Amino acid sequence: MMASQDTKEDVQHSAQKTILVCDDETDLLLMFRIYLESQYKVITVDSGESCIDTILDYKSKNEEIDLLLLDYKLGDISGDIVARKVKEIDDLKILMITAFELDNQIVNELIQQGLIVDVVKKPVQLEQLSQKIKETIAGQ
């Protein structure tokens, strides 16, 4: 009886979607991990370079990342540059996270160019973020 439960959990775990979170604020990375890991496999990185390296690593193993939550203002590079580099590697869905008031023209250009799906403003409302993640992964 226990074996069938383990198998069911394994199947459920393997069907879990993977979210990569890139933010240079470690407290936010921890918050995202704690909030999201009950529903998703969560990978956290604290720099644009680490983000790109992680995506390359997953791609080399033929493993899929389903969504990237990407901070706009990273310590080493801006999020829009990371988004451009990511799109050269993989057609990954990206939600941009920012505490800054981004110009609507910049946001619209990023969306029209297919670099990001949408922008989520900090401070992040976790329930709204959860809904946005579900919609984005589902392709809505």
Residue positions per predicted region:
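Two-component/phosphorelay signaling modules centered on CheY-like receiver
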Residues: 26-44, 113
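Non-catalytic signal-transmission and effector/linker regions of two-component phosphorelay proteins
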Residues: 1-18, 115, 125-140
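Alpha4 helix (beta4-alpha4-beta5 surface) of REC/receiver domains from two-component response regulators
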Residues: 81, 101-118, 127, 131
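Hydrophobic/aromatic residues positioned on beta-strands within the core alpha/beta folds
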Residues: 97-99
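Short amphipathic alpha-helix used as the core "switch/output" element in two-component signaling
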Residues: 80-92
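Acidic catalytic/metal-coordinating carboxylates
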Residues: 47, 78-81
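Acidic, metal-coordinating helix/loop segments flanking the phosphotransfer/catalytic sites
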Residues: 46-67
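Active-site residues of response regulator receiver
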Residues: 71
